């Protein structure tokens, strides 16, 4: 069974997001070994400068580096990433597994995004949409898409 790690910078605060995450955790438990990791968001202040934002992202990146699993493939969720259909994501996950990536790590940054060096280390940069979403909602959307990818691979009726 493939291992999926979803590493998120920032804690879920709203109960409705937590409920949705729990639902997809339950569904995914039949498809993969899922690990959800949360790291604290660095808050640079109310009206931070670009330099303060970069510094906060560097601090977050250092925390992320400590928690990144060894081996496997790293998928950075970022707005400038590649947009894939659900079917294409399923195929990409299968391709990575076929190339020996027994573990996939999806990385969701804080409200300021991800440090550039982390993005460069990624095997794939993935964008959900050209639209902007709260990173808490992105977590739910990503879990749903991972679940959908497994259902596509299995040929179930979930994906229509």
Predicted regions, residues:
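Loop/turn-to-beta-strand initiation segments
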Residues: 3, 102-106
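Short glycine-rich anion-binding loops that position phosphate/pyrophosphate groups of nucleotides
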Residues: 12, 79-82, 110-113
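Conserved strand-to-helix beginnings and helix N-cap segments that scaffold or border functional pockets
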Residues: 17-21, 86-90, 119, 139
